């Protein structure tokens, strides 16, 4: 977890998660094993990030993310 990141209450990070600078996370978020959150991304409350998924920098996540996905944009869409 890098500097200036905000993690809301009741949020869970599994093993091997990476949270870059300036990430903002709402409450009740679940980041599964190996989740990667790029710089300046924003994640809405009650979101689940799948195993080994990548959230691109500057993305705004408003929907759950499947396992092994790459998501980017505002709003975040699955690229792979």
What feature does the model see in each segment?
Residues 1-72, 76-79:
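Structural signal for interior beta-strand "rungs" in well-ordered beta-sheet cores
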């Amino acid at each position: 977890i890098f500097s200036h990141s905000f993690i809301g209450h009741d949020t869970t990070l599994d093993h091997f998660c990476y949270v870059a600078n300036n990430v903002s996370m709402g409450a009740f978020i679940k980041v599964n094993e190996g989740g990667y959150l790029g710089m300046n991304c924003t994640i809405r409350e009650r979101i689940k990030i799948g195993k080994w998924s990548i959230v691109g920098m500057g993305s705004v996540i408003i929907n759950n993310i499947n396992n092994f996905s790459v998501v980017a944009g505002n709003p975040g869409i699955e690229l792979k």
